[in-house]
Regions:
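Pyridoxal 5′-phosphate
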Residues: 1-376
């Protein structure tokens, strides 16, 4: 099997898997308990909190563990119902864990403006500024898009937010471990993360909350996570999240170089095989190792079926159901026409991929394109 869908999820790092097993075996106490078993588990959690904080450039007391990026986003957004200013500026390419939440919040008096993107999937800070109203209390723009990888100008947007006295949230789920992140330098007030995107476990993530800010809990009960997120902590998962973040950031330069070399090799060879292909996303301000490519005349659902038969996992932003295929929402917002849109695939390389994997991938692409052509 050949896995090229690391933007969807990543395999557990072996060291993370080992640590989680050890924590489950030897640190199983309830972290809220005062006895030694509980206190040992609490130390594990606080160690992970420190690792996570160091990875994203903040203080330990600014990191709050959640069940993942979706919960972290929800925690920030649902707090709007407690705020006086209930208008949000966001973008049309945000994850459903932002846009669908905002849709649901409308019945609670929250409104939002979703600014568009350019042909490369980039948000224009000037459009963000123009969308601000007297009632705007939050700006929520992702750090990097999950489908085509474009990195957004968060620092510039942060300057606008600060000038206007507006809080800034950024969904950074796709970015950690791929590009350097420093919450202080970026100037954000809230930032969401998910461990399974950086070789950590599923079902655990984190939210950065700038010191001095307070959020009302979504999940109410005990006093865990300093009363921001009730419920007995997932100690093995949190330990895995912390170590995965540490490992990802410590090797970020090597990872960046490796992923870029794989993407470069793939682009060069696939362009030679099929000269009329189109690469989507920003040519430079892009996550390393993520390639969104359109194959005009070849539907993405057919491409994925043929590639899957060869043991290759890639993905598509297009929704396939009962033989019908709907264009990718993200690519449509970039004004890519439907004919090209439904022929687009996302290839996202990971640290375990090799140049030999790229050779196999491009060889299978070549045979797949030939097979589809001959059967047309």
């Amino acid at each position: 099997m050949h896995y090229f869908d690391h933007s969807a999820t990543t395999p557990l790092h072996p060291k993370v898997k080992k640590l989680m097993g050890e924590v489950g075996d030897f640190h199983f106490g309830n972290p809220s308990s005062v006895h030694a078993f509980g206190q040992k588990a609490k130390i594990v959690i606080e160690t992970a909190r420190g690792q996570m904080a160091k990875a994203v450039g903040c203080n330990s007391n600014e990191i709050f563990f959640t069940s993942g990026g979706t919960e972290a986003n929800n925690l920030v957004l649902w707090n709007l119902i407690h705020q006086n200013k209930k208008h949000v500026v966001t973008s049309v390419i945000e994850h459903p864990a932002v846009l669908k939440v905002l849709d649901n919040l409308e019945e609670f008096g929250v409104s939002y403006t979703a600014v568009g993107v350019d042909k490369n999937g980039g948000v224009n800070p000037n459009e963000v500024q123009n969308a601000i109203t007297a009632d705007t209390g939050l700006i929520s723009i992702m750090l990097a898009n999950n489908e085509m990888g474009t990195i957004q100008p968060i620092r510039e947007i942060s300057s606008i937010a600060k000038e206007q006295g507006i809080f800034l949230h950024s969904d950074a789920v796709q970015a950690l471990g791929k590009i350097p992140i420093n919450a202080k330098d970026l100037g954000v007030d809230y930032m969401s993360f998910s461990a399974h995107k950086f070789y950590g476990p599923k079902g655990v993530g984190a939210l950065y909350i700038r010191k001095g800010l307070k959020l009302q809990p979504l999940i109410i009960g005990g006093s865990q996570e300093r009363r921001v997120r009730a419920g007995t902590e997932n100690t093995p998962g949190i330990a895995g999240c912390g170590l995965a973040a540490e490992l990802a950031v410590n090797s970020i330069q090597d990872t960046h170089t490796h992923l870029e070399s794989l993407a470069k090799a793939f682009k060069e060879e696939i362009k030679r095989i099929s000269p009329d292909i189109i690469f989507n996303g920003h040519p430079k301000k892009n996550l390393p190792g993520l390639v969104n490519v359109s194959f005009p005349g070849y539907r993405s659902d057919l491409l994925m079926i043929y590639l899957d038969r060869e043991g290759i996992a890639v993905s598509s932003g297009s929704a396939c159901s009962s033989g019908d295929i709907k264009p990718s929402r993200i690519l449509s917002e970039m004004e890519i026409n439907d004919e090209i849109n439904i022929c687009s695939l996302r290839i996202s390389f990971g640290t375990g991929n090799t140049l030999e994997d790229v050779d196999y991938l491009t060889t299978c692409f070549k045979s797949t394109l030939e097979r589809i052509r001959s059967s047309a």
